């Protein structure tokens, strides 16, 4: 089982997430017999520090989370406006997703791996399509509570997926201003993908979800244009509607 561990802190509580490849709790987890594979899911654990409580949430189905067949991981969790926001990051097609209905979700057959390879968090299996086929869009999932049921999914084509990347780390780039407006930043990490069809042509930028809204508004800022062509690794909310960005120093 290959796992990616995610962690988000909330005052005296902690949420941890595990992206797993064999989640029996996931509905319809078993793949077609010929693949001998299972669907990916995200297991959420709630830890309360002072009360010393640990609760395991139901496994969230990771496959086809966005309706394009790809599985996702979550880059950060944000509490704002009595909701929970997260940025689902498409990771490509698992062996299960690639084989589903004779390759229904495969846009680029040449990207499907013909043998096992890679190492550590970049390892892959034969039959897998590694990394997303949709680099020119970003998604946000909005949940009503910590049970992580029935999310509202919203999409924008103004930025690429919303997370910073450093090896196996997926950094949160979705933050709320003091007035509840949620700003979604993208460093356009997909620019460095090897395959041209997996590279984004969108610059690093930021979009916004107004407080209480369930869709993006018209706000957009081209961060690369303002920085002379540079992108960033991470970002944080500071105060009001001010944010701190850890910029790259070269193009």
What is each of the regions a protein language model found here?
Residues 25-93, 145:
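Acidic/polar, low-complexity intrinsically disordered N-terminal segments immediately downstream
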Residues 81-82, 179-181, 240-242:
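Short coil/turn segments that connect the beta-strands within blades of beta-propeller domains
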Residues 17-22:
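C-terminal motif of bacterial Sec signal peptides marking the signal peptidase cleavage site
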Residues 29, 36, 67-79, 163-174, ...:
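Repeated scaffold domains used in trafficking and secretory/extracellular systems
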Residues 184-251:
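Long, well-ordered mid-to-C-terminal structural blocks that present hydrophobic/aromatic surfaces
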Residues 50-69, 116-118, 124, 150-160, ...:
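Beta-propeller fold detector
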Residues 134-209:
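Loop-centered beta-sheet repeat module
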Residues 48-55, 101-149, 198-214, 251:
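Beta-propeller blade signature
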């Amino acid at each position: 089982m290959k796992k990616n561990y995610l962690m988000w802190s909330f005052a005296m509580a902690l949420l941890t997430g595990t992206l797993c490849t064999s989640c029996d709790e996931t509905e319809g987890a078993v793949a077609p017999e010929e693949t001998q594979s299972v669907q990916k899911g995200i297991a959420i654990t709630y830890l309360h520090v002072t009360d010393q409580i640990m609760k395991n949430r139901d496994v969230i189905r990771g496959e086809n989370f966005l309706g394009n067949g790809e599985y996702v991981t979550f880059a950060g969790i944000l509490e704002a406006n009595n909701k929970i926001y997260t940025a689902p990051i498409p990771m490509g097609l698992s062996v299960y997703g690639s084989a589903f209905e004779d390759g229904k979700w495969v846009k680029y057959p040449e990207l499907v791996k013909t043998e096992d390879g890679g190492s550590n968090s970049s390892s892959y299996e034969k039959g897998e399509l590694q990394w997303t086929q949709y680099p020119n869009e970003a998604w946000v999932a909005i949940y009503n509570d910590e049970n992580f049921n029935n999310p509202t999914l919203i999409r924008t084509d103004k930025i690429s997926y919303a997370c910073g990347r450093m090896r196996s780390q997926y950094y949160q780039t979705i933050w709320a201003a003091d007035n509840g407006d949620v700003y979604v930043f993208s460093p356009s990490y997909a620019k460095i993908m090897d395959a041209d069809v997996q590279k984004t042509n969108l610059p690093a930028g930021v979009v916004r979800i107004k407080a209480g809204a369930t869709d993006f508004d018209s706000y957009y800022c081209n961060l690369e244009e303002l920085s002379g062509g540079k992108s960033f690794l991470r970002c944080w909310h500071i105060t009001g509607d001010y944010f701190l960005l850890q910029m790259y120093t070269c193009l």
